[in-house]
């Protein structure tokens, strides 16, 4: 058991001890288990991994891991280490049971309120049943209806939401199945999960790296780190330590990254959860989901509703006790008022409105996993976006060329209509020949009908870009190569930093060979003695070297990867046909070459991104780039897409312009700021928050997954609602921590998709703008729906208040209220989700979560005490009219309740002296229920029309633009008619046929509501910022 516990703690700590021995540090944390240490563990995982294996010599590595750089571990030691450390696999967390996920759907803010209301109804049912009250069943039906609403909406939410996020399960797809290992000097294949630290492993192109490995030997080794670090360009791996950071150095290969080409041999230095990828997985799964803004708003709303309900209930409980009711009867009244105050239909309204918006977004390639995330995107004030694959295409493309002493922009379109140089130029032909022949990439067969930019290429990103550019300019690059057969080649390696190949010429009458070379521009130039200018070889003197340096710096400053190209015709005399070229002996010249030109490449921005960033800026949303790529490249892309706006300068730019040291520049003068990972590592949280506050335009480069998470947290400390976009494994912790995580659907890793709340199916950053717009619109429309839904609470509540205090026969029954809440008013309420925006909501600043509430005081006051009061007057006017026309004048109704409800009294006289039996009185009471119901519905038609806008006149918005609302109103009227006049309704739901004139009584009140609201809106529009605006605009 001791070893098992050690393994568990080893995975939690993920750091070395003072001597560099990781196991020693694990034992120190042995007492740190338990829930109380979870936060500390998460903070430890946020820290950068402090390992020094990349800086140790081979002898020191052998000593540290008790291994051999030639024979590997002994089999016995490997077995001991496997027992100590456990398998080389990512340890999945304990999954959330499905019943718990479903239970969460039943326990939100509104759900809890409705559960309490249902419990109160059941208690009231029990009390009334014990007293023999005939209205007992109403409370039972109400309780069952409330429970049904919660369960049905819970099922709906559970169905809509994806299965629970399981971060580490998605990382399993990255784990290789087999690994080539050397133990006791013997080479054999084992399952990758059996690897241990100190194992000597071999890798080749096409393999996935089986663990974190310190490279000992490498030949042409390149790996794809894009999903881990965000770098589009393949990364060279070699035995040399090139950087003090283990994430930056070339002699560490990371677990799960893909080997693109070459071979390598190295020692395993970390396995399983202790690897970089394992650390990210643990970090992502350890981050708790934040409450969404809409969830916070609903909690705030529930607090308001519960507080008002208890206040009113307690007030009238005291009143009932004071006027002589028994305690149990007064308690029943208290419960009835509390339940009447609960908007039973609101939960369904909110769920359906969010679902409709989610469906609308899905049609625009945005899939929402969590319904509440729909509104969150609309509240977003900061977007932290990854660069590679999100803002850019994750596809290297030729961008510029320098030849004949001119820089040309490359046209990578099919028709080549934008090409800015003369393709008949001799220098261009030479440069094109070199970049086509000195290239190992090849098109996958059978793609002749596929457009060149979309063709699949076998090869690394740079050579792919060169091949596609060659295909676009030459027409048939592969056929062109066949005309120049390759006889010799030296692949690119980190020592030489060039690639060389020798070819025979296409002209059979010319028996010469041509040597072509590409590589790092400075390395290629130093092997040249001449330069091609307009097809002529000129001596490479100081003038041309300066011209080269100027062009090189210019292209490099754009954040582009620059390659140099040169050639040399080999004389027939020294290198006749059939000459045996030997790459080991290098029996051919590698100097005295002729420089042809420079080609620069970049992972270009998506075409729609600049416009999307501009729209975000217009909408008051700050876009921050957070990438693992180089600072120069990151800054260049940020400038090209508008994250760094034209004219904005960093501290370094200002210092260069003023020709002063950087430390003499006032940092507050710099609008833009580029911070790399090493700088970020040395900053404390307060410094980072201050930098975010000082510089509106921010770019973070060379960041680790831990740092991305810290950046998100810092933005949240400033009060921002943060959206994070990303596609790589390295983005998953930040995606989980953000208020809303947005993953790429095509290029995104499974880990990123699982951590996110929303997935962009088309990988288009511009789709986020659509999401923001829809999110803002649904917030506005939810506000309207809630205002509409709350208004009728007052005419539903006041009958009970009058019933208790004035002792009139009950004007409105529980079942009738249920039909209002869950039947007739649901459709108009939902139809407001289809309402168009009143103005260009993308020109407004994001809402302030602390100030701009979903349900604020003006909304509650206006809905309850103004429109709700008018509806109550309408209802009582219709009620007393119906009672009077049947012989019960208003003054007689006051205090009538005890006799009216006495089922033993069969001869109660009305105002005309007519005697009424209990059955007749009950029939009249049900008629009054129906009259009050119709009155509310007629006023609610006016209410839904005024809710179309909050500021504009309803005439400006148009009555018939929202056809769904028109249909909902017609449906509402039809339902009302059906309930009133369908045979059998009196016996089933207590609805009675009513006279036509009783439909007309509430209409003047509906007109009053409409006129009153138009006056309110006029004042809001005419007096912005005034008392009228502040108190009456909700």
Swiss-Prot record:
K(+) binds at residues 339-340, 342, 344, 796, 821. Its EC number is 7.2.2.19. Changing residue 812 to G: Inactive due to impaired folding. Has weak potassium-dependent ATPase activity. Keywords: ATP-binding, Cell membrane, Hydrogen ion transport, Ion transport, Magnesium, Membrane, Metal-binding, Nucleotide-binding, Phosphoprotein, Potassium, Potassium transport, Translocase, Transmembrane, Transmembrane helix, Transport. Changing residue 335 to I: Has normal potassium-dependent ATPase activity. Residues 225-239 have a biased composition (Polar residues). It is found in: Apical cell membrane; Cell membrane. The active site is at residue 386. It comes from the Eukaryota. Changing residue 344 to Q: Reduces potassium-dependent ATPase activity. The chain crosses the membrane at residues 98-118, 142-162, 299-318, 331-348, 783-802, 813-833, 854-876, 929-948, 963-981, 997-1017. It is a multi-pass membrane protein. Mg(2+) binds at residues 386, 388, 727, 731. The catalytic subunit of the gastric H(+)/K(+) ATPase pump which transports H(+) ions in exchange for K(+) ions across the apical membrane of parietal cells. Uses ATP as an energy source to pump H(+) ions to the gastric lumen while transporting K(+) ion from the lumen into the cell. Remarkably generates a million-fold proton gradient across the gastric parietal cell membrane, acidifying the gastric juice down to pH 1. This is Potassium-transporting ATPase alpha chain 1. It comes from Sus scrofa.
């Amino acid at each position: 058991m001791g070893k098992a516990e050690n393994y568990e703690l080893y995975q939690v700590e993920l750091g070395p001890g003072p001597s560099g021995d990781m196991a020693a540090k694990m034992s120190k944390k042995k007492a740190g288990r338990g829930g109380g240490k979870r936060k500390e563990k998460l903070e430890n995982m946020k820290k950068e991994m402090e390992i020094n294996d990349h800086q140790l010599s081979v002898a020191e590595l052998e000593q540290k891991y008790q291994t051999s750089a030639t024979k590997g571990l002994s089999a016995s030691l490997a077995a001991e280490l496997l027992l100590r450390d456990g398998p080389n696999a990512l340890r999945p967390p304990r999954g959330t049971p499905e019943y718990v996920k479903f239970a969460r759907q039943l326990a939100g803010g509104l759900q809890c309120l409705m559960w309490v209301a249902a419990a109160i109804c059941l208690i009231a049912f029990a009390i009334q049943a014990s007293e023999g009250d005939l209205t007992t069943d109403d409370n039972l039906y109400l309780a069952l209806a409330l429970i049904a609403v919660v369960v049905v909406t819970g099922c709906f939410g559970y169905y809509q939401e994806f299965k629970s996020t399981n971060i580490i399960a998605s990382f399993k797809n990255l784990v290789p199945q087999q690994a080539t290992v050397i133990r006791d000097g013997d080479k054999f294949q084992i399952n990758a999960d059996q690897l241990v630290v100190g194992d000597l492993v071999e890798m080749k192109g096409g393999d996935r790296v089986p663990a974190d490995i310190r490279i000992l030997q490498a030949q042409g080794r390149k790996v794809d780190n894009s999903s881990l670090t965000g770098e589009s360009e393949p990364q060279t791996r070699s035995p040399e330590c090139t950087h003090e950071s283990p994430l930056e150095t070339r002699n560490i290969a990371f677990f799960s990254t893909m080997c693109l080409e070459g071979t390598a041999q190295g020692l395993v230095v970390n396995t399983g959860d202790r690897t970089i990828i394992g650390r990210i997985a643990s970090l992502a799964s350890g981050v708790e989901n934040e409450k969404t803004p809409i969830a916070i708003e609903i909690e705030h709303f529930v607090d308001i509703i519960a507080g008002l309900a208890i206040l009113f209930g307690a007030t009238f409980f005291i009143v009932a006790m004071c006027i002589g009711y028994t305690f149990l009867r007064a308690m029943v009244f208290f419960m009835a008022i509390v339940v009447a105050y609960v908007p039973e239909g609101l939960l369904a309204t909110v769920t359906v409105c969010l679902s409709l918006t989610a469906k609308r977004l899905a049609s625009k390639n945005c899939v929402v996993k969590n319904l509440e995330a729909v509104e969150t995107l609309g509240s977003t004030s900061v977007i932290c976006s990854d660069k590679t694959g999100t803002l850019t295409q994750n596809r290297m493309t030729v961008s510029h060329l320098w030849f004949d002493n001119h820089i040309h922009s490359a046209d990578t379109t099919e028709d080549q209509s934008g090409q800015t140089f003369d393709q008949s130029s001799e220098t261009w032909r030479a440069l094109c020949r070199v970049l086509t022949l000195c290239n190992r990439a090849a098109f996958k067969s059978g793609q002749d009908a596929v457009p060149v930019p979309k063709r699949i290429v076998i090869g690394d990103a740079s050579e792919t870009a060169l091949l596609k550019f060659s295909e676009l300019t030459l027409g048939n690059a592969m056929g062109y190569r066949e005309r120049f057969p390759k006889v010799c080649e030296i692949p690119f390696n980190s020592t030489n930093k060039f690639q060389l190949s020798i070819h025979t010429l296409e002209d059979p009458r010319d028996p010469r060979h041509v040597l072509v070379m590409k590589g790092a521009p400075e390395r290629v130039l130093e092997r040249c003695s001449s330069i091609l200018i307009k097809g002529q070889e000129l001596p490479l003197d100081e003038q041309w070297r300066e011209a080269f340096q100027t062009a090189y710096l210019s292209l490099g400053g754009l954040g582009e990867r620059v390659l140099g190209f040169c050639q040399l015709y080999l004389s027939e005399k020294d290198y006749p046909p059939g000459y045996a070229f030997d790459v080991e002996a290098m029996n051919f010249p590698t100097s005295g070459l002729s420089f042809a030109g420079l080609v620069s490449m970049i992972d270009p921005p998506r075409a729609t991104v600049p416009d999307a960033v501009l729209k975000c800026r217009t909408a008051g949303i700050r876009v921050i780039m957070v990438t693992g790529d180089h600072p120069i490249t990151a800054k260049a892309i940020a400038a090209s897409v508008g994250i760094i706006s034209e004219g904005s300068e960093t501290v370094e730019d200002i210092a260069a312009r003023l020709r002063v040291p950087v430390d003499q520049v006032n940092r507050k003068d710099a609008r833009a700021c580029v911070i790399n990972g090493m700088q970020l590592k040395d900053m404390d949280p307060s410094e980072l928050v201050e930098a975010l506050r000082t510089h509106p335009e921010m770019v973070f480069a060379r960041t680790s997954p831990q740092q991305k998470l810290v950046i998100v947290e810092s933005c949240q400390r400033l009060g921002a609602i943060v959206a994070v976009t990303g596609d790589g494994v390295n983005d998953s912790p930040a995606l989980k921590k953000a208020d809303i995580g947005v993953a790429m659907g095509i290029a995104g890793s499974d880990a990123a998709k699982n951590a996110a709340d929303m997935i962009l199916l088309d990988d288009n950053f511009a789709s986020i703008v659509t999401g923001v717009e829809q999110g803002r619109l649904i917030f506005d429309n939810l506000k309207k729906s809630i205002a509409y839904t709350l208004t009728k609470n007052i005419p539903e509540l006041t009958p009970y208040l009058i019933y208790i205090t004035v002792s009139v026969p009950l004007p409105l029954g529980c079942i009738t209220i249920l039909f209002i809440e869950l039947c007739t008013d649901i459709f108009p309420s939902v139809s407001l989700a289809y309402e168009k925006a009143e103005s260009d909501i993308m020109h407004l600043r994001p809402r302030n979560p602390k100030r701009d509430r979903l349900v604020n005081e003006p909304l509650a006051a206006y809905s309850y005490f103004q429109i709700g009061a008018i509806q109550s007057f309408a209802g009582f006017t219709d009620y007393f009219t119906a009672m009077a026309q049947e012989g019960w004048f208003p003054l007689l109704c006051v205090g009538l309740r005890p006799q009216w409800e006495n089922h033993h009294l069969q001869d109660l006289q009305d105002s005309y002296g007519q005697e009424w039996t209990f059955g007749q009185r009950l029939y009249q009471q049900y008629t009054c229920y129906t009259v009050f119901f119709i009155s509310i519905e007629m006023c609610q038609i006016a209410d839904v029309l005024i809710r179309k806008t909050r500021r504009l006149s309803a005439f400006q918005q148009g009555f018939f633009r929202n056809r769904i609302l028109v249909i909902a109103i017609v449906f509402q009227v039809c339902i009302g008619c059906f309930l009133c006049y369908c045979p059998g309704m009196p016996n089933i739901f207590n609805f009675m046929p009513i006279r036509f004139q009783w439909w007309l009584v509430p209409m003047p009140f509906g007109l009053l509501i409409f006129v009153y609201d138009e006056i309110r809106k006029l004042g809001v529009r005419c007096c912005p910022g005034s008392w009228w605006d502040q108190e009456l605009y909700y």
